[in-house]
Amino acid sequence: MATIIYDNETTFDALKDKTIAIMGYGSQGHAHARNLHESGLNVVVGLRKGSSSWAKAESDGLKVMTVEEAAKAADVIMILLPDEKQASVYYSQIEPSLEAGNALVFAHGFNIHYNQIVPPKDVDVFMVAPKGPGHIVRRTYTEGIGVPGLIAVYQDATGKARDLALAYAKGIGATRAGVYETTFREETETDLFGEQVDLCGGLSALIKTAFEVLVEAGYQPEMAYFETCHEVKLIVDLIYEGGLERMWHSVSNTAEYGGMTVGPRIINEESREAMYEALARIQNGEFAKEFVLEGMVNHPVLKAMERQEKEHPLEVVGKEIRANIPWLNKKIDDD
């Protein structure tokens, strides 16, 4: 079982008198930077010249520099850029300024685990990965709570990498909910597996296929959308709040019996084998190689799939239905 560390077991001591550079000011970047700053730590934000986020970060009360300037100024450097951009930015704008005893921090282990970034041996390398989107990391921090997080140490040059990781996790509010110790390998491989097999890939494929079956069987697209896509959130919220047990307890007996008897026929041994195949491609680096090569030519396959997805009948009818839900439109505007 994983080791869990809570707020009362941690201090900011390891980060006192250190400058933390947050590279990037997107969903996670803005949350990390603002939370750390409001925790009393010394934070700078590293952005490219001309970035649309520059003025936003300054208006949030943060000191903003170019990535190169931030790397030179910092003792601890958190890289919160898209996976496919991290290596090029690291080698051209961060590594030249690294000094012995500095620390590199990641929120996902992809580039370290798959050797896209190979840090010098005299710097600490660790991970702090909150298990929630940036706006939730930020909101829960301001509410005095937090989201759970993961920490991992890849390289401990100073002997203080774990202390730094815990202090950083405390600074963003993660220790309030508990941080779980893991490894770069475990975090990377399980994260990719979850994204591909159920959270993003498996779930979206299941929704689309179920929608298509109902429409092909002659049912109205609107009815198919409500039953196969719209109501997913209702079920997921129940699982999120209390696990599968809470979900089964909350639905009707008809839904429970039908779900328990038919579900295993849909997600069956063939599905399990496909999951193992996906996991093997993650473990042996095949997926990483494919993704890196795709990024080197500006993601033509991904862009084509995005276009196809946008044109899918599920998306067309879903857009029309969501336009008629005022409270949902307000939430999207607020986000």
From Swiss-Prot:
Q: Where is the KARI N-terminal Rossmann domain?
A: 1-182
- Asked whether the UniProt record includes NADP among its keywords, one would answer yes
What are the residue boundaries of the KARI C-terminal knotted domain, all occurrences included? 183-328
So what does this one do? Involved in the biosynthesis of branched-chain amino acids (BCAA). Catalyzes an alkyl-migration followed by a ketol-acid reduction of (S)-2-acetolactate (S2AL) to yield (R)-2,3-dihydroxy-isovalerate. In the isomerase reaction, S2AL is rearranged via a Mg-dependent methyl migration to produce 3-hydroxy-3-methyl-2-ketobutyrate (HMKB). In the reductase reaction, this 2-ketoacid undergoes a metal-dependent reduction by NADPH to yield (R)-2,3-dihydroxy-isovalerate.
A Pfam family that the UniProt record links to this protein: KARI_N
Q: Which cofactor does it need?
A: Mg(2+)
State the free-text cofactor note.
Binds 2 magnesium ions per subunit.
Q: Which gene encodes it?
A: ilvC
Which UniProt keyword terms apply here? Amino-acid biosynthesis, Branched-chain amino acid biosynthesis, Magnesium, Metal-binding, NADP, Oxidoreductase
The family note in this entry says: Belongs to the ketol-acid reductoisomerase family.
Which Enzyme Commission number(s) are listed?
1.1.1.86
Q: Which InterPro entries match?
A: 6-PGluconate_DH-like_C_sf, KARI, KARI_C, KARI_N, KARI_prok, NAD(P)-bd_dom_sf
> What's the name of the protein?
Ketol-acid reductoisomerase (NADP(+))
Question: What reaction(s) does this enzyme catalyze?
Answer: (2R)-2,3-dihydroxy-3-methylbutanoate + NADP(+) = (2S)-2-acetolactate + NADPH + H(+); (2R,3R)-2,3-dihydroxy-3-methylpentanoate + NADP(+) = (S)-2-ethyl-2-hydroxy-3-oxobutanoate + NADPH + H(+)
Q: Which residues form the active site?
A: H108
Amino-acid positions noted as binding substrate in the UniProt annotation, renumbered to this chain: S252
Coiled coil, from the record: none
Question: Tell me, what is an example of a GO biological process annotation in this record?
Answer: isoleucine biosynthetic process
Annotated residues for binding of NADP(+)? Y25, G26, S27, Q28, R48, S51, S53, D83, E84, K85, Q86, G134
Q: Where does Mg(2+) 2 bind?
A: D191, E227, E231
Group of enzyme by EC: oxidoreductase
Give one GO molecular function term.
Answer: ketol-acid reductoisomerase activity
For the ligand (Mg(2+) 1), the binding residues are: D191, E195
